[in-house]
Amino acid sequence: MNDRLGTPRREIVMLAAAFGPVCFRLMAAAQQERDPHPVNADQALRDLLAGNHRFTAGATLMPRRSPEDFRALSGGQFPEAVIVSCADSRVAPEILFDVGVGDIFVVRVAGNVIEGTGVIVKGSIEYAVAELNVPLILVLGHSGCGAVKAAKKHIDDKDSLPGAINGLVELIKPAVARSKGMSGDPLENAIRQNVETGVEKLQRMEPILAPRVKAGTLKVVGAVYDLQTGAVALNGKAK
């Protein structure tokens, strides 16, 4: 191309090669920007289930996980949901729901126990709801949960476990007992009942959660994550 007619073609190609990646990153960052105001509970739940579908389909987006994304949230956080999950190393909510930094507020405790855990778990959940205005709490159990399995064995064998483990399984035993007599796999029933017990506890928890549940501004649901398939299935009717 003649210089009098504009920038030579060779220079245009060089400029495109130099600035193309930068433009792509800026466009991607713009697409991944979050609305700082939390969505409602139904939309938050749809987002989580859609992310899990991507995870099981092998089509994860893995959004907002760069150092720049972490720095962008250094001044505040706007999670869509609280996930109360087991501490099991195979359960990683950010991965199985295909979300990025700042999307979910995760509280992890062995057996995803709510009852009897004191101010640490309760205060963490209440903080997310009261201060961060999170509209959804999801209690997430998982297949083959060792804590529930230990509680079931504790009841069946009437044995004693060492240290604080014994106290932990004592908190799960009522849910295991409630699952007795249900049709189907005894361990799976106990795991689902343990999740449901946690959901019921949170729905009644005063003074922060229960009024919001009653007013319809907070939803508490339960689900179970299948370690074999990666799928998350809601635990009965979402309330």
Regions found by a protein language model. Give the residues of each.
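Short beta-strand segments
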Residues: 84-86, 108, 138-142, 221-226
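Glycine-rich, flexible N-terminal cofactor/catalytic loop recognition
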Residues: 69-81, 86-91
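Thiamine diphosphate
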Residues: 54, 78, 94, 98
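Divalent-metal-activated hydrolytic enzyme cores
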Residues: 13-14, 32-76, 111-123, 127-135, ...
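Active-site cofactor/substrate anionic-group-binding motifs, chiefly glycine-
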Residues: 87-112
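Boundary at the C-terminal end of the N-terminal hydrophobic targeting segment
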Residues: 28-30
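N-terminal secretory signal peptides and thylakoid transit peptides that target proteins
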Residues: 2-20
